[in-house]
């Protein structure tokens, strides 16, 4: 992938950009094999990759510069701003949105937040695109609601320029810290969720729900999990740390009883909407802490699927699963180091199958799917 920003030394986010994709995959596979070296692995599946550029469905832009000439991108460690509108990880459809947002920021009088001076209002622009219909969700992250009336007044101009903006919100983040969003979300459109579709499964994206940033690879990850589950004798399963329900909704059948657990209520609202559309009555989603939910249960299903954040599932859940011993565990991880640590805490299980998914090209990061079977 060619990147003018990297070549000019202005952005170093894609640290592996000079390596061809096959070399990147080899290095990631070697890293994963090294982390799992202590465990016998029955089957190593071929790694899955997607496009090497234009694959991201989301942009998180720090807003800097002046209200007349805003910059959308990032701040270097020394506070110097960098405009990243030309980043080749973004699809071509993002360029006209960035181009319209710059004059809009001036029209609405949204003064960019100055980190050094702790002044200004507009902190971030968050943009997400649906692959299914090209609809977009735009979020303005503001320090306060001071400019809200001005933004509302100027909004019709932006909506006229960009009819693809289906969901528009303001998020209030009052704290002087590098935190992407606050708790308060104010909807400026009637529509509150973005419709997405992977492998004929309807998914919904709401402002404060996590969603994978590489749809081409994420859809293959979900389809693979579905294939693995279909090969197992399973009538009942849990989907822990389920997010908007991507795994559970793919794995569910009219015959499988499935419970999805996720702490974020916004994500659970998305999952419930999808389940209703699919007409799956034996599928239920609840907004709870996954570890607390599981460890309070007196019995476990045949299969527990976990998709934890980077920190892994942790010792309390590992201990519970070791004691209760479900026949199968499918572990989806964005941090193979913590996954390996967790597997070490599950000595009663062997690794049946492992597959690497290159969700984050040009970086050392990757996603991995592992099937564990009770010995």
From Swiss-Prot:
PROSITE patterns: SAM_MT_RNA_M5U, TRMA_1, TRMA_2. It catalyses: uridine(747) in 23S rRNA + S-adenosyl-L-methionine = 5-methyluridine(747) in 23S rRNA + S-adenosyl-L-homocysteine + H(+). CDD domains: AdoMet_MTases. The active site is at residue 334. S-adenosyl-L-methionine binds at residues 212, 241, 262, 307. One of its GO terms (molecular function) is 4 iron, 4 sulfur cluster binding. [4Fe-4S] cluster binds at residues 3, 11, 14, 87. GO terms for biological process: rRNA base methylation. The keyword Isomerase does not apply. It comes from the Bacteria. InterPro entries: 23SrRNA_MeTrfase_RlmC (IPR011825), MeTrfase_TrmA_AS (IPR030390), MeTrfase_TrmA_CS (IPR030391), SAM-dependent_MTases_sf (IPR029063), U5_MeTrfase_fam (IPR010280). Keywords: 4Fe-4S, Iron, Iron-sulfur, Metal-binding, Methyltransferase, rRNA processing, S-adenosyl-L-methionine, Transferase. Its EC number is 2.1.1.189. PANTHER family: RNA M5U METHYLTRANSFERASE, TRNA (URACIL(54)-C(5))-METHYLTRANSFERASE. Catalyzes the formation of 5-methyl-uridine at position 747 (m5U747) in 23S rRNA. Belongs to the class I-like SAM-binding methyltransferase superfamily. RNA M5U methyltransferase family. RlmC subfamily. This is 23S rRNA (uracil(747)-C(5))-methyltransferase RlmC. It comes from Escherichia coli (strain SMS-3-5 / SECEC). The lineage of its organism: Bacteria, Pseudomonadati, Pseudomonadota, Gammaproteobacteria, Enterobacterales. The gene is rlmC.
């Amino acid at each position: 992938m060619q990147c003018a920003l990297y070549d000019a030394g202005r952005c170093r986010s894609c640290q592996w950009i000079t390596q061809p994709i096959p070399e990147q995959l080899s290095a990631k596979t070697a890293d994963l094999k090294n982390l799992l070296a202590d465990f016998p692995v029955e089957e190593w599946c071929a790694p899955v990759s997607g496009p090497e550029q234009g694959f991201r469905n989301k942009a998180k832009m720090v807003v800097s510069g002046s209200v007349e000439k805003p910059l959308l991108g990032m701040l270097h460690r020394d506070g110097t701003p960098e405009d990243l509108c030309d980043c080749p990880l973004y699809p071509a459809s993002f360029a006209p949105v960035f181009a319209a947002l710059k004059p809009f920021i001036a029209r609405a009088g949204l003064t960019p937040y100055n980190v050094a001076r702790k002044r200004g209002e507009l902190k971030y622009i968050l943009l997400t695109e649906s692959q299914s219909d090209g609809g977009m969700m735009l979020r303005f992250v503001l320090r306060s609601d001071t400019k809200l009336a001005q933004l509302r007044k100027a909004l019709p101009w932006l909506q006229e320029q960009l009819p693809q903006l289906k969901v528009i919100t303001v998020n209030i983040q009052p704290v002087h810290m590098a935190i992407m969003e606050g708790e308060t979300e104010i909807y400026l459109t009637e529509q509150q969720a973005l419709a997405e579709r992977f492998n004929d499964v309807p998914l919904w994206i709401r402002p404060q729900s996590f969603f994978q940033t590489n749809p081409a690879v994420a859809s293959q990850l979900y389809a693979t999990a579905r294939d693995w589950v279909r090969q197992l004798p399973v009538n009942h399963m849990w989907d822990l740390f389920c997010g908007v329900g991507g795994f559970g909704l793919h794995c569910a059948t009219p015959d499988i009883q499935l419970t999805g657990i996720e702490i974020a209520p916004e994500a659970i609202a998305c999952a419930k909407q999808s389940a209703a559309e699919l007409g799956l009555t034996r599928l239920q989603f609840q907004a709870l802490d996954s570890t607390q939910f599981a460890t309070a249960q007196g019995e476990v299903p045949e299969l527990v699927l976990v998709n934890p954040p980077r920190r892994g599932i942790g010792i309390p859940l590992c201990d519970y699963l070791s004691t209760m011993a479900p026949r199968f565990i499918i572990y989806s991880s964005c941090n193979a180091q913590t996954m390996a640590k967790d597997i070490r805490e599950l000595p009663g299980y062997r690794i049946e199958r492992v597959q690497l998914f290159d969700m984050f090209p040009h970086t050392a990061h990757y996603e991995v799917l592992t099937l564990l079977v009770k010995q």
